[in-house]
C-alpha cells in the first residue's frame, strides 16, 4: 500500500478505524469519510471529511477533494452502514428505507463517485456485505435485504469494470464491537470476527497482491 491513497467510509466506527490504521501502517495515504468527524482521529495526517454518503453530489465532491489533495485514489473501502432488528409484522417502513440508504445507497454512491479516479489507477473497491444476507434469521429482513443488494452490486460492478477496477466484498458474521457486545451480552465474544482481522482481509483485497481477484464475495466467519 506504500504511496497509495485509500478511502475509508464509516471511518470512525470500530472497523473503519481498524482499516484506516492498518492502511496507514502499510504506508498508504488515508482519507477517512464519515457522517461526522471525531476529534480522536486514530490516523495522524489522515484526510478527515464529514460527508452524507446517502447524497451522491456530496459524495462526489468528497472524492474530488481527496483526489485533489493526494493526486490519486487507489482503493475505496465501503464500511459505512447500519443495523436494525425488526420483524416485518411489528416493524415499520422507515426502518427498511433507512437500511437501504445506509447499507446499499452509500455503497452505490461511493463507488460511482470514485470510479473515474479508480479507473485512472486500476484501483479496487471493497464492500462490506454480510453472512446474514445469505441466510437471514427472524428480524433480519431489512438488514439482510439491504446487504444482499450490496452483494449483487459487487458482482454486477465487477463485471462492468472487469480489467479496469476490481470489486470485491467481505461477508462477516458478527464483528466484535462494543455495540454488538451490549446487544448480545451472553454470547461467546471469542468466536466473533475481530475488526483487526477483518481489516487485514479487506486490505489484502484492496492490494496488488489480489490483482487477479474480482467479483468475489468472501465469507469471514470467525468461529461463529
Where does each model-flagged region fall?
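C-terminal helical subdomain
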Residues: 163, 169-170, 177, 186-224
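Conserved glycine-rich cofactor-binding loop
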Residues: 12
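Active-site helix of classical SDR
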Residues: 111, 146
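Active-site-adjacent segment of SDR/Rossmann-fold oxidoreductases
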Residues: 135, 156-165
Amino acid at each position: 500500500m506504500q504511496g497509495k491513497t485509500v478511502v475509508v467510509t464509516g471511518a470512525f466506527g470500530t472497523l473503519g478505524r481498524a482499516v484506516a490504521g492498518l492502511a496507514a501502517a502499510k504506508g498508504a495515504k488515508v482519507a477517512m469519510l464519515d457522517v461526522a468527524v471525531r476529534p480522536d482521529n486514530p490516523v495522524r495526517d489522515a484526510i478527515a471529511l464529514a460527508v452524507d454518503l446517502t447524497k451522491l453530489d456530496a459524495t462526489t465532491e468528497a472524492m474530488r477533494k481527496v483526489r485533489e489533495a493526494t493526486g490519486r485514489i487507489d482503493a475505496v473501502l465501503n464500511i459505512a452502514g447500519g443495523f436494525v432488528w425488526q420483524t416485518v409484522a411489528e416493524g415499520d417502513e422507515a426502518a427498511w428505507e433507512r437500511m437501504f440508504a445506509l447499507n446499499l445507497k452509500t455503497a452505490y454512491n461511493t463507488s460511482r463517485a470514485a470510479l473515474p479516479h479508480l479507473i485512472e489507477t486500476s484501483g479496487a473497491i471493497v464492500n462490506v456485505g454480510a453472512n446474514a444476507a445469505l441466510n437471514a434469521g427472524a428480524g433480519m429482513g431489512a438488514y439482510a435485504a439491504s446487504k444482499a443488494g450490496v452483494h449483487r452490486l459487487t458482482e454486477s460492478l465487477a463485471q462492468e469494470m472487469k480489467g479496469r477496477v476490481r470489486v470485491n466484498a467481505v461477508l462477516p458474521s458478527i464483528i466484535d464491537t462494543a455495540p454488538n457486545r451490549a446487544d448480545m451480552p451472553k454470547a461467546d465474544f471469542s468466536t466473533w470476527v475481530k475488526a483487526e482481522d477483518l481489516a487485514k482481509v479487506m486490505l489484502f483485497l484492496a492490494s496488488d497482491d489480489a490483482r487477479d481477484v474480482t467479483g468475489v464475495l468472501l465469507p469471514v466467519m470467525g468461529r461463529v
